[in-house]
Amino acid sequence: MKKRKSKSWAMAYCGMAAALCVALMLLGTIIPIAMFIAPAVASFLIATVCMECGITMAWTAYAAVSLLGLLFVPDKEIALIFTVLLGYYPLIKPKFDRIRPRALQLVCKLLLCNAAVLAMYSLLLVVVPAGSVSQELRTTALAMTLLTLGMGNVAFALYDRALCNMLLLYKLKWQPKLHKMLGMH
């Protein structure tokens, strides 16, 4: 007989996942290479909340992690990457995955990524102005910005694929073990 998940179990799972997400983002502040890895792993945890507890609880966890991250994570860029793009992406990914053909699907995903990144850095530049920069540096900065944005698109496409694979692994391997351990099999 299959046991049903109680509301208290769902709330506890949601709270634990949210706390772990914030802890990961705090860890991303300490370990420089984890600056982009921490929000990506945190977004995977939000996706597991969606799978275990439903979309409403997942959006609640996303909102809690975003707010707590912006309040407590010292490196605001990590919290903003989660809040502006990676945190909610697993929740809207199924809608993007229905788009056909696949080339259009990828274009739509990259448009979301670019819009989110440009909005985030525009906000950062408004809050923390860069001051006056010589014309020579502006040209170099534009080229580097475009190069970085291109590399970010490649990284986002890889993240999208990795998220798909990790969720499949979770569903096939980790979720049954979690349910068995908790007596929910």
List where the protein language model places each region.
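Alpha-helical transmembrane segments and their cytosolic interface
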Residues: 2-3, 7, 142-185
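Hydrophobic transmembrane alpha-helices
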Residues: 2-53, 57
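Membrane-interface helix termini and inter-helical loops of multi-pass transporters
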Residues: 127-141
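Transmembrane alpha-helical core residues of multi-pass small-molecule transporters
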Residues: 42, 61, 65-69, 85-86, ...
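Mid-bilayer segments of alpha-helical transmembrane spans in multi-pass integral membrane proteins
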Residues: 75, 110-127, 153, 157-158
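Hydrophobic alpha-helical transmembrane segments
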Residues: 11-15, 37, 59-63, 79-80, ...
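Interfacial aromatic-anchored transmembrane helix boundaries in multi-pass membrane proteins
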Residues: 26-35, 66-95
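Short helix-perturbing small/polar motifs within transmembrane alpha-helices
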Residues: 83-122
